[in-house]
């Protein structure tokens, strides 16, 4: 029962020396290259981001070290959050397009059978 109530940490924030908010490493647990590379792409589209990269420390670990460094003192949390939101939007668009295509295919198939 205790295992059910325990909640694993899925995201940690590790700040660089000097407690500067513009240079942060986010540790994402239970994730791999699928999220890492997609999120890196979305974050790098932001012109305020100076550096963005990720690493997986060991092949047997399921965590990503995701680092963001911004320009002009902008907190790294902002482009991280924006990148996640944009990635969700892209995934939602792909899902909607896929579902629409499936629906159209089924309608065409039914029309051809009549």
Curated annotation (Swiss-Prot):
Keyword tags: DNA-directed RNA polymerase, Nucleus, Transcription
Subcellular location: Nucleus
GO CC terms of this entry: RNA polymerase I complex; RNA polymerase III complex
Classification via SUPFAM superfamilies: RBP11-like subunits of RNA polymerase
GO MF term (any one): DNA-directed RNA polymerase activity
GO biological processes: transcription by RNA polymerase III; transcription elongation by RNA polymerase I
Keyword Calcium: no
Keyword Cell inner membrane assigned: no
Pfam family for this entry, one: RNA_pol_L_2
Annotated PANTHER family: DNA-DIRECTED RNA POLYMERASE I,II,III, DNA-DIRECTED RNA POLYMERASES I AND III SUBUNIT RPAC2
Subunit structure: Component of the RNA polymerase I (Pol I) and RNA polymerase III (Pol III) complexes consisting of at least 13 and 17 subunits, respectively.
Function text: DNA-dependent RNA polymerase catalyzes the transcription of DNA into RNA using the four ribonucleoside triphosphates as substrates. Common core component of RNA polymerases I and III which synthesize ribosomal RNA precursors and small RNAs, such as 5S rRNA and tRNAs, respectively.
Similarity-based family: Belongs to the archaeal Rpo11/eukaryotic RPB11/RPC19 RNA polymerase subunit family.
Name of this protein: DNA-directed RNA polymerases I and III subunit RPAC2
Organism, scientific name: Xenopus laevis
